[in-house]
Amino acid sequence: MPVTTTYRYTAATATPTHPDPTQIETVLARLVPRCIRPQKSNAELQAIREAGLASAISRTPRPRIGIYTMVQAHQDPAVRLAVARGLAVRNGWLLERAPAVDFTGMTEPVTRPQLARLLDALDRDEVDGIAAMSRTDFSDRNGDYEDALQRIHARRGFLALATTETDI
């Protein structure tokens, strides 16, 4: 009578299905979500913004500016635009384009069409920076505001605000 062998599947006989730890560590290092990234304070965000502004002004003493504001659908943006425009005029900056106004309310900055157009203008070197009344034109959440600053700085642009981050 022939002998049949029954193979039993156990943890000891299973083929390893885990990637080695170095692969996991590599992937995790790339995927640091904002929720576990330490939040920067308003003062730290102000320092980041001002460093970018100083760097850009040293390269271009009379930069070309795009004016930006975000308001609720029923709000008039005139006051916010006037304050941002006044900031640009006081500093002798050039107003290169029509103001960009998003009537989206406090949505994530990456979803706003007029802000995207200004970022594209930075990419195409049509403007050197963005002027706004306050950081709340971008976000009142530090993580979203930091992301917006990073997007602007990655394009060698700057953000100039009429009020400081600690004034929100």
Model regions: which residues?
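Short, structured surface patches at the beginning of a domain
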Residues: 1-168
